[in-house]
C-alpha cells in the first residue's frame, strides 16, 4: 500500500461462525484521540456484526456493505457472533503511521464515513490488561 508510511503489519483475522469479540479498545486510554487507525478488508463473512459504543452506550453497527474500512482502535468496539466464518485482512497493530497526503485523500474521498460519538466514560473491562499500566 503506497500510502502507508511506515508500512503496516499485515495479518489475517479469522473469526469462526458463532463467535464474537467483547467490547474492547485496541489502545491505551492515553492514546484515545490519537491516530490509532486500523485498515480492514473483509474477505468473507458478516460485515454488519461490528459495532461501536456511542456516548449513550448504544451499539452503533456498521452497514453490511462496508467491506473495506478504516476504524479507530481507540474507540470502544465489538463484534457480535455471525452466522458465517469471518475472514478479514488487517493492516495495523493498530497502524499509527503518518497522515501522508495520499492517505489523507483516501480518508477524505471515502464513499462511506461514519461519525460515532464516544462514550463519556469507559468501562474497566474494555481495556485489555495488556494495555493497562
Regions found by a protein language model. Name each.
Residues 14-16, 32-49, 92:
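Short, conserved beta-strand element in jelly-roll/cupin
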Residues 42-64:
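A short beta-strand-loop-beta hairpin characteristic of the jelly-roll/cupin
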Residues 37-43, 68-72, 83-101:
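A short hydrophobic beta-strand segment most commonly corresponding to one strand
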Residues 89, 93-133:
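Long hydrophobic alpha-helical segments typical of transmembrane helices together
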Residues 8, 21, 37, 75:
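Short beta-strand or tight-loop elements
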Residues 22-26, 50-56, 81, 91, ...:
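A short secondary-structure junction signal
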Residues 1-19, 25:
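Signature of the catalytic double-stranded beta-helix
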Residues 60-76:
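Conserved metal-binding segment of the jelly-roll/cupin
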Amino acid at each position: 500500500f503506497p500510502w502507508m508510511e511506515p508500512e503496516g503489519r499485515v495479518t489475517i483475522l479469522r473469526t469462526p461462525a458463532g463467535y464474537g469479540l467483547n467490547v474492547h479498545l485496541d489502545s491505551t486510554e492515553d492514546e484515545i484521540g490519537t491516530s490509532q487507525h486500523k485498515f480492514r478488508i473483509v474477505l468473507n463473512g458478516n460485515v454488519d456484526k461490528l459495532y461501536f459504543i456511542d456516548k449513550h452506550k448504544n451499539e452503533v453497527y456498521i452497514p453490511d456493505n462496508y467491506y473495506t474500512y478504516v476504524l479507530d482502535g481507540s474507540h470502544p468496539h465489538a463484534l457480535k457472533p455471525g452466522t458465517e466464518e469471518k475472514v478479514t485482512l488487517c493492516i495495523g497493530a493498530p497502524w499509527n503511521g503518518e497522515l501522508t497526503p495520499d492517505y489523507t485523500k483516501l480518508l477524505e474521498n471515502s464513499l462511506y464515513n461514519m461519525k460515532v460519538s464516544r462514550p463519556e466514560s469507559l468501562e474497566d473491562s474494555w481495556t485489555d490488561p495488556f494495555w493497562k499500566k
